Amino acid sequence: MTIVRKTHPIMKMVNHAFIDLPAPSNISGWWNFGSLLGLCLIIQIASGLFLAMHYTPDTLTAFSSVTHICRDVNYGWLIRYMHANGASLFFICLYLHIGRGIYYGSYSYMETWNIGILLLFRTMATAFMGYVLPWGQMSFWGATVITNLLSAIPYIGTDLVEWIWGGFSVDKATLNRFFAFHFILPFIIAAMAMVHLLFLHETGSNNPLGIPSDCDKIPFHPYYTTKDFLGIVLLLAFFFTLVLFFPDLLGDPDNYSPANPLSTPPHIKPEWYFLFAYAILRSIPNKMGGVIALILSILILALFPHIQTGKQRSLMFRPISQFLFWLLVSDVLVLTWIGGQPVEPPFIIIGQIASVLYFTFILAFLPIAGLNENKMLKW
């Protein structure tokens, strides 16, 4: 008797990707975040679809339509908070996934890594546009400040900003187009995630030791489906604790006030998951320089495969690089904290030092540490 999953054209693809996929026998819980990101994307698309049924992308009614969802729609408050906190959960998993890739040297798979960086940019763009939609104070001013950064581009900057706005300020046209893009981008992200998986399955997964594992592979099901299921249960437990008990913990209180172009909030800041990049942007006094630093803070991830100097792929047996990696993680946390603080001493100088260290760790300290470890191991 032929097994359907091995012969049916569609089932065969699913089988090769999730059932009979040969996987290294020693991958740890840090490899769970790929499947958790898939779950987060499903939660976001599903909750977003239901929100879009009741939301109106119009400056006069956007804020009240969100209020209507929370007050009048059956379980609307739950759907709204699932979507808002789902974004935070998405970025938590995303940053842990990237951190694991850096720690264990997964950036050696160039195509997979580069598509991952494009996915990160797409996700950040989607989250930013989604943050504008409730049309609260921070939504409006966040959109104004961040889109205005494009005016730093020589010659075409001002025209480009007005083209994106659809007028001379953030208004109805801006909200409408942001809603359209926010709706379509998650489906593009889902398609790109499939390509990300396709390239990953061409090379096979990395493992904590960073060594070839072709001699010791096990089927993905039942071993890693069970392991992923445990990760999903833990993630959902954390997620619903956040949604049901602390729904506004990661939000901004200013967004409970309707957008008012005549009143500027005392401190404009994006959502918490962009604060590290926002701190780097603010730490450079020049507008153009700040925008370049902001883009490079993410784009620098693409350099990892090219500046890897260690003969060992993983940091598991490289104590100096391990120490520097955790200093880099601490530095990103400091930048996140600084991004949420007002622009005044001592936060300005702390942000500038942390920004310089961020680039120095990646471009200088980690490659030098790799060379030193090679010498210590007589390689």
Curated annotation (Swiss-Prot):
Q: Which CDD domains match?
A: cytochrome_b_C, Cytochrome_b_N
Q: How is the cofactor bound?
A: Binds 2 heme b groups non-covalently.
Query: One GO biological process from the UniProt record?
Result: mitochondrial electron transport, ubiquinol to cytochrome c
Q: Which UniProt keywords apply?
A: Electron transport, Heme, Iron, Membrane, Metal-binding, Mitochondrion, Mitochondrion inner membrane, Respiratory chain, Transmembrane, Transmembrane helix, Transport, Ubiquinone
Query: Among its keywords, does the record have Acyltransferase?
Result: no
Residues annotated to bind heme b b562: 83, 182
Q: Which residues bind heme b b566?
A: 97, 196
Subcellular location(s) per record: Mitochondrion inner membrane
Q: How does it sit in the membrane?
A: Multi-pass membrane protein
One Gene Ontology term, aspect cellular component? respiratory chain complex III
Q: Which InterPro entries match?
A: Cyt_b/b6_C, Cyt_b/b6_C_sf, Cyt_b/b6_N, Cytb/b6-like_sf, Cytochrome_b, Cytochrome_b_C_euk/bac, Cytochrome_b_N_euk/bac, Di-haem_cyt_TM
Question: Which segments cross the bilayer?
Answer: 33-53, 77-98, 113-133, 178-198, 226-246, 288-308, 320-340, 347-367
Q: Which residues bind a ubiquinone?
A: 201
- At the top level, the lineage of the source is Eukaryota
Q: Which cofactor does it need?
A: heme b
**GO molecular function: any one?**
metal ion binding
Summarize the subunit comment. The cytochrome bc1 complex contains 11 subunits: 3 respiratory subunits (MT-CYB, CYC1 and UQCRFS1), 2 core proteins (UQCRC1 and UQCRC2) and 6 low-molecular weight proteins (UQCRH/QCR6, UQCRB/QCR7, UQCRQ/QCR8, UQCR10/QCR9, UQCR11/QCR10 and a cleavage product of UQCRFS1). This cytochrome bc1 complex then forms a dimer.
Function summary: Component of the ubiquinol-cytochrome c reductase complex (complex III or cytochrome b-c1 complex) that is part of the mitochondrial respiratory chain. The b-c1 complex mediates electron transfer from ubiquinol to cytochrome c. Contributes to the generation of a proton gradient across the mitochondrial membrane that is then used for ATP synthesis.
Q: Report the family membership.
A: Belongs to the cytochrome b family.
Q: Which PANTHER family match?
A: CYTOCHROME B
Q: Give additional notes from the record.
A: Heme 1 (or BL or b562) is low-potential and absorbs at about 562 nm, and heme 2 (or BH or b566) is high-potential and absorbs at about 566 nm.
Its recorded name reads Cytochrome b
Q: Which organism is it from?
A: Dipodomys ordii
Q: What is the lineage of its organism?
A: Eukaryota, Metazoa, Chordata, Craniata, Vertebrata
